[in-house]
Design a protein with these regions (language model features):
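Catalytic core of pol beta-like nucleotidyltransferases
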Residues: 1-23, 32-37, 48-104
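Conserved H-loop
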Residues: 29
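Short, conserved active-site loops that position catalytic residues or coordinate cofactors/metal ions
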Residues: 39-41
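Short hydrophobic/aromatic beta-strand micro-patches
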Residues: 44-46
Length: 104
């Protein structure tokens, strides 16, 4: 299990490497308080605007180097979040419903 100090550090790193106004949300098993022995961390990073979400995800994932855990970093623009937040079954809906904000 990954301790809260490490999770908070990851949130700070992701927020610090992102544009102003970015929100970092932890979701998945750690946010629900149900991590298993092999659980990774799942982050939704909501940026004001995103040109290429895949490239930004890779760039942000690199900021977590040195923290010894597996992580998924999903990047979405504020507009994409608005478009998908009410669509049940979507990743964005689930992340917002179960997640907790680490950094804003």
């Amino acid at each position: 299990m990954i301790d809260e100090a490490t999770i908070d550090e990851a949130g700070r790193r992701l927020a610090g490497a992102s544009p102003p106004g970015t929100r970092v949300i932890l979701f998945g098993s750690h946010a629900r308080g149900e991590p298993g022995k092999h659980s990774d961390l799942d982050f939704l990073v909501i940026e004001p605007e995103v040109e290429n979400a895949a490239e930004e995800s890779v760039r942000l994932r690199r900021t977590l180097r040195g923290l010894l855990f597996a992580a998924d970093v999903i990047v979405a623009s504020e507009q994409r979040v608005r478009d998908w937040r009410d669509v049940k079954g979507s990743l964005i809906h689930a992340a917002l419903a179960e997640g907790r904000e680490l950094a804003a």
